[in-house]
């Protein structure tokens, strides 16, 4: 997928925050202001977004994992949907401290959730009292909400993609600590520090968020498709197929 300037304008990617809330470190990406609202320079954003997508494409081609992070109301649904479409893990509820830096502990909760799912599938609820079944369902629901999106992650991701880096400071800090590259949408009220692939843009509009998230999901699918195509072409080679006759 190639994103155009027109699409970014239509999605409102250029609208920043009120000028009084600005972060001076975002000055290089600000075009000006209108009605006390900063306007982001999309001529800077577009190539930076394309660089981020190129990186994601290469990562996916090498079977890398990108963890999608977006827990704000306007990003939750689309983020979970697009991460699912790309077959990638995601966090759409609260970020639990230590989700990356203490992944060993998180893995215990993931195992518990998977065991509960298997037990439910096997009809365990039928052998429980009403109260036990209710408590079981509640615990499972709670685990599904907090870690359901990462239950198949397996290990530390190769990169994280964050919508609104200020809102997800803990996630960014944990990734920085572990040397995990961060792709992040940075609005005018936050700092681009600690973000390896900065996407200067509006992080509040659901239309803008949908554009970034779909773009990253598409890049992952393209990267995977390209890798498969290369394998198929390499397998074909110039060798002629010879059927071996049974003796």
From Swiss-Prot:
One of its GO terms (biological process) is translation. The gene is rpsB. CDD domains: RPS2. Transmembrane segments: none annotated. The keyword Metal-binding does not apply. It comes from Cupriavidus metallidurans (strain ATCC 43123 / DSM 2839 / NBRC 102507 / CH34). GO terms for molecular function: structural constituent of ribosome. NCBIfam families: rpsB_bact. SUPFAM superfamilies: Ribosomal protein S2. GO terms for cellular component: cytosolic small ribosomal subunit. Belongs to the universal ribosomal protein uS2 family. Keywords: Ribonucleoprotein, Ribosomal protein. This is Small ribosomal subunit protein uS2. InterPro entries: Ribosomal_uS2 (IPR001865), Ribosomal_uS2_bac/mit/plastid (IPR005706), Ribosomal_uS2_flav_dom_sf (IPR023591). It comes from the Bacteria.
């Amino acid at each position: 997928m190639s994103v155009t300037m027109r699409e970014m304008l239509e999605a409102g990617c250029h609208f920043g925050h009120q000028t009084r809330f600005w972060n001076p470190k975002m000055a290089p990406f600000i075009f000006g202001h209108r009605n006390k609202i900063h306007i982001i320079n999309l001529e800077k954003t577009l190539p930076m977004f394309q660089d981020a997508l190129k990186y994601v494409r290469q990562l996916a081609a090498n079977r890398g994992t990108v963890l999608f992070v977006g827990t704000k109301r306007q990003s939750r649904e689309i983020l979970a949907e697009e991460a699912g479409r790309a077959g990638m893990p995601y966090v759409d509820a609260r970020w639990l401290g230590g989700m990356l830096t203490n992944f060993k502990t998180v893995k215990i909760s993931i195992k518990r959730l998977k065991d509960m799912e298997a037990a439910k599938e096997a009809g365990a609820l039928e052998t429980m009292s009403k109260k036990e079944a209710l408590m079981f369902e509640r615990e499972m629901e709670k685990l599904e909400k907090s870690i359901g999106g990462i239950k198949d992650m397996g290990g530390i991701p190769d990169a994280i993609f964050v919508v609104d880096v200020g809102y997800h400071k803990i996630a960014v800090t944990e990734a920085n600590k572990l040397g995990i590259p961060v792709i992040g949408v940075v609005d005018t009220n936050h700092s681009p520090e600690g973000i390896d692939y900065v996407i200067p843009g509006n992080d509040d509009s659901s239309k803008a968020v949908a554009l970034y998230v779909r773009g990253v999901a598409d890049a992952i699918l393209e990267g995977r498709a390209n890798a498969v195509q290369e394998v198929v072409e390499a397998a074909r080679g110039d060798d002629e197929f010879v059927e071996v006759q049974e003796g």
